[in-house]
């Protein structure tokens, strides 16, 4: 994974490009781990944590801001996202762990896919952010064609306000 490790000082900023991170080939590891701030302003970011521990696709000690880009984080833990984020985001905690090589699709109420990817590793918590996410729209996650039950953070969030509820 990517680790910036000067405690409470580091600022990891992603402004563009494509990052595909498959972390923790050993016993642990977050996808992207900033011991300060993590700011994503653009690009395509796919961050998968180690499947063996309590690691996150995106992890920051102080704050995570999602301001743009297409972002997918998969792991077994999730850090709180900043209310200063400028882009919608969703965090799903699934009822059971998604196996590696699972096809994940997130669809809106019209059946249009807003996310489609195959997991590199197993994980239970999925974070997703993209410019085409909308507030007050119900999204349905499916894994290998089966609609998933999820708990916990069932929300579309956006900086500057409380997250909107999602049906699940």
Where would I find each of the regions flagged by the language model?
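A composition-driven surface/loop motif
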Residues: 1-168
């Amino acid at each position: 994974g990517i680790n910036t490790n000067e405690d409470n000082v580091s600022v990891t900023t992603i402004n563009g490009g494509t990052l595909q991170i498959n972390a923790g080939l050993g016993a642990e590891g977050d996808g992207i781990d900033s011991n300060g701030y993590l700011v994503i302003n653009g690009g395509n970011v796919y961050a998968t944590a180690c499947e063996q521990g309590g690691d996150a696709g995106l992890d920051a000690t102080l704050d995570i801001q999602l301001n743009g880009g297409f972002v997918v984080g998969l792991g077994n833990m999730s850090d709180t996202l900043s209310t200063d984020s400028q882009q919608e985001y969703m965090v799903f905690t699934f009822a059971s762990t998604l196996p590696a090589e699972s096809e994940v699709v997130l669809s809106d109420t019209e059946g249009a896919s807003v996310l489609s990817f195959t997991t590199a590793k197993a994980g239970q918590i999925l974070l997703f952010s993209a410019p085409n996410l909308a507030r007050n729209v119900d999204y349905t996650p499916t894994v290998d064609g089966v609609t998933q039950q999820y708990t916990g953070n069932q929300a579309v969030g956006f900086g500057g306000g409380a997250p909107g509820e999602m049906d699940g």
